[in-house]
Amino acid sequence: YKWLNCNQVERVWEQRNLCYEYGVRKLWIVNVGDLKPMEYPIQFFLDMAWRPEAFNPNNIFEHTITFAAQQFGEEHAKEIADIIKLYSKYARRVTPELLNANTYQFSYDEWPTVVREWNNLELRALRVYQKLDPRWYDAYEELVLFPIQAMQNIYEMYYSVAMNAKAESPTEINYWAQRVEKLYERDSLLCAHYNHEIANGKWDHMMDQVHIGYTYWQQPEKQVMPKVKKSDEAAYLCHKETDGYISIEAGNFKNNHKATVIPDLGKTECAVTTL
């Protein structure tokens, strides 16, 4: 709740409407957390505070479209509004500070599903970015693209931590451990891009908030990469068949061989010869 926006405007409407209906109409106070990441929900709150009766569950999305049009023009406003809506829906499930490898389960396909949702949303956001007028790039990164990429990355990182814990073979264990390390590094690169490159560093230090390494509600002093296990055993690629038909590429032998591999010969990966 400190690092990125995790507020759904639908929730803002529901709570403010309760206030209004129960007679709290003179003064509304909101703890914004941090102004910069919360620009859109703050805008919604202020607009609703000005005219509470103008908002209802069926026209909230229209407000998001209007906001997107004001920032990026009419052409892509509806698509951007839908991306913003889905971002806040996904982000609201759990704050990035409290996300960890045990947040979602594998038994109900939860982890792969939520990671896939974030991956698809990032692709949508990138496609729109490429269509925009360059004068809107900075604003789009601040309001739309960076939050999605940052959340997608942290979700994939903790998913990789979970896969590392679940893995049994040395190859899988080390693959997922390396994946965690790369994603942890990418988190710092994304934040550095926001701080130093977007708008020529106008918002330097805005993304310095610690968001990885929480063990309880209070924030740690510094970022700490999630723990992973590693294997020192010699690792080999294992080919598993699930359809009853067993085959491997000619060059994927493991031992007891005197063959020479010829890359790219044949229909698939390679061929072998005894010469």
Regions found by a protein language model. Name each.
Residues 1-10, 50-54, 69-73, 105-112:
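The substrate-binding groove and active-site-proximal loops of carbohydrate-active enzymes
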